[in-house]
Amino acid sequence: MRVIPLASESLGVRSLATFVEASGIKILIDPGVALGPKRYGLPPAKAEMEVLQKMRRKLQGYARRSEVVVISHYHYDHHTPFFEGLYESSSESYAREIYEGKPLFIKHPRENINFSQRKRAWAFLKNTEPIAGKIEFADGKSFDLGGVELEFSPAVPHGSEGSRLGFVVMTLIDDGSKRVIHASDIQMLNRKSVEWIIEKVPDLLITGGPPTYLGKRAEGSWQAGIKNLNEIIRETGAEIILDHHIIRDKNYPRFFDELEEIPKTFAGYLKVEDRPLEAYRRELHKIEKGGEAEIPFKLS
């Protein structure tokens, strides 16, 4: 099995897009890239916009190769919408290239879903139903792809129990020799998702950490995330790729150090430098205006 992390916060954008080739079947999970429209009261810096375009080109390249598409939920950093979006680098042609003629395994568009995601799911289905090979509402189901089992969790909270952000589904890919779980926006903050991961005993877990960058709005999430991740590490022995929300916090290396096994970011897994651009947006704007600011990565 070949696992290729495509785009994420450690690579400069909001995403957890991943390409998996298992027994010759090419699977694209959460094909979206985006930028936070406001951070520290600032719009994306020029460096972020450039990386967004680069990540979009990379994502489309892997979309052309992929045969199966999985969507965990309907936030725009996890799927590509059909509209022209500046901070999503989206368009109808990009979306068609990703979804046309392919089987889509997607989070249920009407059950266990909040109002915002329900609207987005409606728009997504309106555009994909005429062009997709087939569409499966995947929550809690398993599918045999011919030597590869694709298993989906029931809908679990996007973050902590009772989250207003809705629900997501996790994906297990098993080719008989390796088990990989992609668990996008669980944020390591709810028991249901932690217990499902432990029950499935993955060899590799690709997941996002808690949104500690939100400060008081995410109070207690640091400690809860550490506790839950350490439990998964102890109970499964899985290799962990940890990225997404936690990398929007400049203090994420300290979070990694508090874990019993230090995970890799997407960048670390690809053996390139972490470039958490959003976390350093204030500094990037200063540099782009000709000022000086310290950042822990190279800009090009």
Curated annotation (Swiss-Prot):
Pfam families: Lactamase_B_2. Coiled coil: none annotated. It comes from the Archaea. Gene3D superfamilies: Ribonuclease Z/Hydroxyacylglutathione hydrolase-like. InterPro entries: Metallo-B-lactamas, RibonucZ/Hydroxyglut_hydro, UPF0173_UPF0282_UlaG_hydrolase, UPF0282_hydrls. Belongs to the UPF0282 family. This is UPF0282 protein TON_1363. It comes from Thermococcus onnurineus (strain NA1). The lineage of its organism: Archaea, Methanobacteriati, Methanobacteriota, Thermococci, Thermococcales.
